[in-house]
Amino acid sequence: MSTLTPAYDNKIYQKYSKKMLQNKEKNKISFCQDFGLNYDKRIPLLCLTFPLTEKNNLGILQDIIQGILEQDVMLAVTGIGTEKYQNFFNELAKEHPKRISIVSDNDGNKRKIYAASDIFLATAATEECKEEIEKAMNYGVIPICPANELVADYDGAREEGNAFVYKENSPWSFFASLIRAMENFKFPYDWRTIQQSAMSEPEDEKESDEE
C-alpha cells in the first residue's frame, strides 16, 4: 500500500499536490480559523506532532522556545506526552492563544496539521520522530531535524535538499537551522522547490481515504 498523499486525502480541508501547491495555503487558512490562530500568509506555521517525552529530546525546544516566539511564527502541537511537557505547552498556549494551538491527537487532526503547516520541528531522530517527519514531508512540510536517512540538508546554491539539518544537539544549533528555514520561507519560489523535493507523490497509485 502506498503512502496516503494530500492529493487523495479526504480528511484535509483542500486536496493538493506537487503541481497544485497553491492549494496547500487554503488548508492553512481553514486550520487557523478552526483552531483560533491569526492567519498571515507571511508567517510560517510550525508544527510538532510526535509524543512529548524525554526520549524525544523536548528539552532542546524548551530551552529555546522564547527565542522562537520572538520571531513571527505560529505553532500547532498535538499535546500528548509526559505531564511536564504537556503542562509546558498548555501554559504557552494560554499565554499566546492566537499564536499557539494545542490540537487533539488523532489521525484526522494530524493530517490537517500536516496540510496546514510550513515547518516541522523535530527535536530527535527516534523512530517515532522519523515516522512523523516522513508523513509531514509527504504533505510538503519542511523539517528542522537532526541528520537522518530521510533528509538532505538544503543547499541554496544548488537548490537541492528537503530539510534544514542541525548538526549539533544543542538549542542554538536547532535555532540556527530554524532561522535558516524562515529566511528561505520568505522567498516563495525557493520554498516551493524545497517542498517539491520533500513530497512523495506516486502518480500510478491513487488512494483515497473514505473513512
Segments (PLM) and residue ranges:
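Catalytic cores of carbohydrate-active enzymes across secretory and cytosolic contexts
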Residues: 1-211
